[in-house]
């Protein structure tokens, strides 16, 4: 699908052409996944850019809390952020979008999962009906399993969300604390994902996959530190949804040209290229592909293999 055009666009460094070619974004936090210019036009002012590298999720959250969240508070702000995310995906040629909606957000609709789902359906149809939107529920790892289950249960009657993801502070609590939550999600046929191996070590990746029975991992880049963990991921066909610019800006890698995605790929692990938080890191998926090409991490042909990984 569009292999020749994609390769030519990379070789010619034609970002507009790249944006026209079908791709996926499987690691996207909805509130932070939007088109920055769209939000700026709505609020009537320019939002500061993150220009310096930071070293922790806490630093990122502080930056977001100061520079962005004040403009997207409440139901109206939430819906504008979702609009911006759909607009960003459409403009970037993303035809498959797995976008993370925090399980708590039904509280913006008086606790109604049904009303939240109605809003998401409406916004999807209005702003990006051509995008295959695969809704994902997000669990903050700092919240107790008991409370997450309480927030999660009302969604189960609607069969709308297709996957779940665990994100936030990797060290907030062990994966074993969340087994019941993930068993519940699995019993409903949801795809199981989690953020792991971004700040944590390689061993934590295998442990989390085994304990929570994960299908995919968000980040997982520290797997390169263990050949046995890489073998485990390859053997079990665990896909890693990687966000290169996010990894660089959060100081998880020193240079893009040495990003571990190369070694993971060479060890037979299925990887995809994604955005994480466009509002913060300012790169769409097209820019991420071009960055990896410019930094000679992959050839254009290899990047097309990775692009197609995400579309399958």
Locate predicted features:
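Conserved hydrophobic beta-strand within the GNAT/NAT acetyltransferase core sheet
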Residues: 192-194
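Metal-cofactor-binding active-site regions of metalloenzymes
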Residues: 1-190, 199-204, 211-212, 216, ...
